[in-house]
Every structure is written in structure tokens, then in C-alpha cells.
């Protein structure tokens, strides 16, 4: 919980990572090779974060993510109410194997799906490799968070096509498309009621404020991308700077900081 104008605001981070990396990705400096449940809980306590949605860290080499999915499911049980696990899937492995991993994740009790089209070398709207996963996700009522931005395979346009083709499937555009994609993501969200966006990675405040003003506070989720960004950065961006510029109501802050992700995950 954090205090805003005398009001207690619950905080649930909708975008975080756990696990261990085997090979270093060149763009991550300083290198983050391992971030486990204990590290997550410490970061949460330091930032006043009540809960997190978390999924496997990019492993740095081809993987089906089974091992980390299992670890996250175990952590979710150990820290019930604080850790909400998503399974990570690699569509590039083909639909047969990946659907099996998905069904295993459902049995583990994981609450959603994360896909990074760039790391997995698979366009977000791939009809043969991704759409069977979306059909299964929709069947099981699992929200899907796509990394959005930095490359054509993960473009807002491609993910928007998925959202249009699966209108009952909750889609989260991770990082809101980053700075270059924010406005396109907002336009998609205005047309597709199943599209949401998280705050992580939108470093230019005017664009982030536009996402709230144009798409509405019921479509924006607080997310940090921890451990790659400190949780406190995103909290301050929203509750201090965006609130000042937009004069957000406390009710709007509650939606962004926890209410929207609780609704998507059916957390009471």
C-alpha cells in the first residue's frame, strides 16, 4: 500500500519477471542473470507493492520455459496473494509442443500467458503458431500479455490483429508499445474493448499521460518490468507526475495501480 492524499492505495505490479538467465542478452546492462522469489518479495516490500504479476525472465537461449513456469507456480503457492504467476510460452517451438506447455501451465494454476514475439522469433499474429494458443487461452479464460514494441514482429498492428480476431480474450500490450508505439496502441484500445496496456517502458511522460487521457484509466495498468526497472520509478511516474498533470481522481489511481489487473485476473 502507498498513501496518496491521505488515501491508502493498493499496488499490484502487472509486469515483472523472475527466474535465471543462461545467456546474457546484449541490451541488458547491467546484466541481470538471476532474480528469484526472495528478490521479488524484497523489492515489493521496499516499494510498498502488495502483489505482482510475474513470468519467466528471458532465458537467453531457446527454451520451452517449463522449468521457470513450474518455479513461478510453486512461488505463487508459497506466497499466495502476493505472487500471481503467468506462464511464459515460446510459439516458435510450434503449436503442438507449446499447446502442451500451455495445458501444463493451466494445471499448475498459472493465471495468464506472456509471449515475447521478438525473443521467440515469431510474429504476434502468426496464424499457425500463435492463434492455436489464443484459442486455448480464450477457452481457459487466460489473459495474454504480449511484449509490444521495438520490432515488427511485436508491433501494435500485429497484436491489434490478434485482439480483433479474439474479441473475448483480454490482451495486455506490454510497455504500451514503448514510446514509438503508444499512440497506435491507444487507437487500437479505443476500438477493441479487450485491449489494455501497462505503464512499463513509456519513459516520456506526455505520451504516458495521453494513454490515460485517450484510452481511459480503466485500460491502463501499473507495471514496472522489474528487475529491469525499479518498481518505485513507475509508481512515482503515475502517482506523482501523471496525477499532477491529469488531476487524476483517487478512484482512477485505484484502477490503474491495482483495480484493472484484479478485474482481469478475477482477484477479489
What spans do the regions from the language model cover?
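Mid-to-C-terminal alpha-helical segments outside catalytic/metal-binding sites
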Residues: 1-14, 18, 23-51, 217, ...
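Hydrophobic faces of well-ordered beta-strands that scaffold small-molecule active sites
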Residues: 11-16, 52-54, 84-88, 113-115, ...
Amino acid at each position: 500500500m502507498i498513501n496518496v492524499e491521505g488515501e491508502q492505495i493498493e499496488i499490484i505490479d502487472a509486469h515483472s519477471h523472475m527466474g535465471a538467465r543462461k545467456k546474457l542478452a546484449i541490451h541488458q546492462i547491467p546484466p541481470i542473470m538471476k532474480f528469484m522469489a526472495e528478490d521479488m518479495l524484497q523489492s515489493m516490500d521496499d516499494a510498498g507493492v502488495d502483489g505482482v504479476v510475474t513470468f519467466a525472465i528471458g532465458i537467453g537461449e531457446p527454451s520451452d520455459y517449463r522449468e521457470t513456469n513450474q518455479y513461478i507456480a510453486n512461488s505463487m503457492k508459497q506466497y499466495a496473494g502476493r505472487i500471481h504467476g503467468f506462464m511464459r510460452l515460446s510459439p516458435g517451438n510450434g503449436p503442438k509442443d507449446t499447446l502442451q506447455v500451455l495445458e501444463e501451465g493451466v494445471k499448475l494454476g498459472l493465471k495468464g500467458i506472456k509471449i515475447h514475439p521478438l525473443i521467440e522469433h515469431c510474429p504476434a499474429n502468426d496464424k499457425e503458431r500463435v492463434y492455436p494458443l489464443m484459442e486455448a487461452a480464450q477457452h481457459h479464460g487466460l489473459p495474454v500479455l504480449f511484449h509490444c514494441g521495438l520490432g515488427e514482429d511485436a508491433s501494435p498492428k500485429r497484436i491489434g490483429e490478434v485482439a480483433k480476431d479474439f474479441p473475448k480474450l483480454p490482451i495486455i500490450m506490454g510497455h504500451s508499445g514503448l514510446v514509438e508505439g503508444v499512440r497506435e496502441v491507444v487507437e487500437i484500445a479505443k476500438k477493441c474493448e479487450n485491449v489494455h496496456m501497462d505503464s512499463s517502458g513509456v519513459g516520456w511522460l506526455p505520451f504516458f499521460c495521453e494513454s490515460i487521457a485517450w484510452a481511459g484509466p480503466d485500460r491502463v495498468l501499473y507495471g514496472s518490468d522489474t528487475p529491469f526497472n525499479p518498481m518505485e520509478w513507475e509508481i512515482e511516474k503515475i502517482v506523482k507526475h501523471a496525477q499532477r498533470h491529469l488531476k487524476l481522481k483517487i478512484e482512477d489511481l485505484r484502477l490503474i495501480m491495482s483495480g484493472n489487473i484484479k478485474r482481469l485476473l478475477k482477484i477479489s
